[in-house]
Amino acid sequence: WIGPNKEALAASKGVKTPPDLKESFNGGPLNIPLGVLDKQAYEFCYQPTLFPEIKGFKEAWISYYREMEILAKEIMTVFAVALGLETHYFNKFINHPISALRALNYPPTQNVKKLEQHRAGAHTDYGSLTILLPEPGSVGLQIFKNGKWLNVPPTKDCFIINIGDLMELWTSKRWVSTLHRVVAKVNQPRRLSLAFFHQPDWDAEIKPIFNKPLMKSVKSGPYLMKKFLSTSH
């Protein structure tokens, strides 16, 4: 669990802001793969999730996480086909993904006291893709496109799929990691959402697939850890 005013997501982009007005319950991979020798990987990705003592919560969480793993792998297959690659091109990078599930609570905003304080500061997601399930009727999510912030209202019975930093790197910015935020305006209602952040294997080397690479290769796990730690407030 990460409480309000403990994380500033804009810091992952090198932007200094007040901490975010949100809280989250977080869980990582359900199983530890055999042969994990990297101490950083073990400590950062594979610590047991401390579930609250609420009847059915743990079972529902684990079930949802597993379904998201399946869906994310299917989406990665669709991505490969869309990019003109072999159907299962990305499979070798996601044998033991270090994906995270976050249940996000953005409390009501009666007062916004600090300038540029948002419920989630402007940031991009760090992995390959994100599967977001917002509560129906929720407000506040915005993406930055063509120099403007645009609202992203939820659509009934639909996920929002977001491109992450590693997919941008793979595609040499052919597909762009979406800059987004959750704004805080006076008298906004509570916002709830579930976000599944699909992340390739800890030691997967991510490098541009196509010609004229614009970005240097990175290791999936260390990149994720560096970004995550940069947001701690």
Question: Where are the regions a protein language model picked out?
Answer:
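Peripheral, non-catalytic segments flanking oxidoreductase cores
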Residues: 1-233
